[in-house]
Amino acid sequence: MKKLFPLLLTLLLISSCEDSIEVTTTTNINESASVTILETNGTAINFNEVIEGDLNQLVSNFNSINDITIDSLSYTFANVTGNENAVITSATIEINATTVAVISNINIAQEALNGSVFEITDTAVLDQLETIFLNNSSVTVQLSGMAISDEGDVNFDLEFSMQLTAAF
């Protein structure tokens, strides 16, 4: 019995020493793309904008990451100048070739004026992006679609915000 207590204490200490300490860091990524849609004459025109980035520049020791969680992902329209009646008739937002949003019939100026924030909450999409980011540090955001701006040119920014937590 005298030897059992020290043995149990030793086993407890050894097993607790083996537990690894997980270190996490949270970072915010904010990027924007400036989009110009020229005046249309009753017919929607194509547009395509791309933002590229690298998580290595934002998260030190990126290669040591063993888990990534996207805490939030959203986009907004901002800094609209020109035609206030321009409409995105249809568009797709992709991150690393994964569709995160499909847009249709949005008045760009109205959404900017309202301060609308479009949250991406689909867990399947977020899980897919987390897996992609674990294997590839490059981030490519693409906005492509069709728009009508019959009353003149319109310029606006499409702003993306992503908060992610990385575990080492």
How would you describe each model-predicted region?
Residues 37-72, 78, 83:
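Post-signal-peptide N-terminal segment of Sec-exported extracytoplasmic proteins
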Residues 76-87, 148-152:
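Extended, low-complexity, turn-rich repeat/linker tracts enriched in Gly/Pro/Ser/Thr and Asp/Glu
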Residues 99-127:
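An anionic, turn-rich surface loop/hairpin at beta-sheet edges
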